Amino acid sequence: MKLSPKDNERLKIFMAAELAKQRKDRGVKLNHPETIAYISNWVCERARDGMDVAEIRQEATSLLTREDVMDGVPEMIDMVQVEPTFSDGTKLVTVHDPIRGDTREQVE
């Protein structure tokens, strides 16, 4: 199987995001790289599903809370930028302040 550099990067994001999801599901707090991968993968998958950029930006801020990540991680991530492929091409998606609530109830 031959992968382009972009496909190789996407595969790495997916693998890191899957590890992050498993850890989150077990109640393990995510570190900085896991958090970035988790959000980035979600953004790429929603783009693939056909969501528009505005919807993705809005919903991505409710994926994780301070309860889900290690201390200090929310302060280290003021934005996440990803270039997913949409049906009409690749677009830059910027999610500002992706970790907003302290608890799940505050986000919902």
Curated annotation (Swiss-Prot):
Q: Where in the cell is it found?
A: Cytoplasm
Could you tell me the superkingdom of the organism this chain comes from?
Archaea
One Pfam family assigned to this protein is Urease_gamma
Q: Which GO terms describe its biological process?
A: urea catabolic process
CDD domains assigned to the protein according to its UniProt record, in alphabetical order? Urease_gamma
Q: Which GO terms describe its molecular function?
A: nickel cation binding; urease activity
| Catalytic activity, reaction form | urea + 2 H2O + H(+) = hydrogencarbonate + 2 NH4(+)
- Keywords associated with the record: Cytoplasm, Hydrolase
Gene Ontology cellular component terms for the protein in this record: cytoplasm
Pathway of action: Nitrogen metabolism; urea degradation; CO(2) and NH(3) from urea (urease route): step 1/1
Please give the positions of the paired cysteines in each disulfide bond: none
Keyword DNA-binding on entry: no
Q: EC number(s) per UniProt?
A: 3.5.1.5
Which segment of the chain is annotated as a signal peptide? none
Q: Which InterPro entries match?
A: Urease_gamma (IPR012010), Urease_gamma/gamma-beta_su (IPR002026), Urease_gamma_sf (IPR036463), Urease_subunit (IPR050069)
Record bears the keyword Secreted? no
Q: How does it assemble?
A: Heterotrimer of UreA (gamma), UreB (beta) and UreC (alpha) subunits. Three heterotrimers associate to form the active enzyme.
The similarity annotation says: Belongs to the urease gamma subunit family.
| Listed name of the protein | Urease subunit gamma
Q: Which organism is it from?
A: Haloquadratum walsbyi (strain DSM 16790 / HBSQ001)
